[in-house]
Amino acid sequence: MSHRTSSTFRAERSFHSSSSSSSSSTSSSASRALPAQDPPMEKALSMFSDDFGSFMRPHSEPLAFPARPGGAGNIKTLGDAYEFAVDVRDFSPEDIIVTTSNNHIEVRAEKLAADGTVMNTFAHKCQLPEDVDPTSVTSALREDGSLTIRARRHPHTEHVQQTFRTEIKI
């Protein structure tokens, strides 16, 4: 049995599903006569709504739950850097992805079972303060399973209001 990461598994699945959908578009008209089926998620939502009525998640609520209660610690200011730690002890290093985008840091992890199904997930997202250099984000995984994220602060500079004048001849 070969060891695959969640990224490899997702890449294989997305390739197979996209290639199968493109091949189905070229299939004969007999296959187009099959009745349309609801995607599995829509069926699940429909069954949920039947039992509990209409329920929507407020936009302020997170989509994922931390791996452990209190999984994300407080953000600390350490000199010229910010630092926070998250508990990802249930995941292998290759299961963890840290991304910086649009002034946010996001930590995601996904553990797969041997059959390729998702066993456990983790997601934590936080907004970077305005004085952080987003290209300076680093992470380190400790032996106890905590992932430490650090980001350097921009040096404090006085904001100087620039005054200028532009003249255009018409």
UniProtKB/Swiss-Prot annotation:
Disulfide bonds: none
InterPro entries xrefs: A-crystallin/Hsp20_dom, ACD_HspB7, Alpha-crystallin/sHSP_animal, HSP20-like_chaperone
CDD domains: ACD_HspB7_like
SUBUNIT field: Interacts with C-terminal domain of actin-binding protein 280.
sHSP domain residues: 62-170
PROSITE patterns reported in the protein's UniProt record: SHSP
Keywords tagged on the record: Chaperone, Cytoplasm, Nucleus, Stress response
Chain intervals for the UniProt region annotation (Required for localization to SC35 splicing speckles): 1-71
Protein name, as recorded: Heat shock protein beta-7
Chain residue ranges for the region called Disordered: 1-39
Main location: cytoplasm
GO biological process: heart development; regulation of heart contraction; response to unfolded protein
GO cellular component: actin cytoskeleton; aggresome; Cajal body; cytoplasm; nucleoplasm; nucleus
Biased segments, Low complexity type: 16-31
Molecular function (Gene Ontology), one example: filamin binding
UniProt similarity note: Belongs to the small heat shock protein (HSP20) family.
Tissues where the protein occurs: Isoform 1 is highly expressed in adult and fetal heart, skeletal muscle, and at a much lower levels in adipose tissue and in aorta. Undetectable in other tissues. Isoform 2 and isoform 3 are poorly detected in heart.
Coiled-coil intervals: none
Compartments where found: Cytoplasm; Nucleus; Nucleus, Cajal body
SUPFAM superfamilies listed in its UniProt record: HSP20-like chaperones
Protein source organism: Homo sapiens (Human)
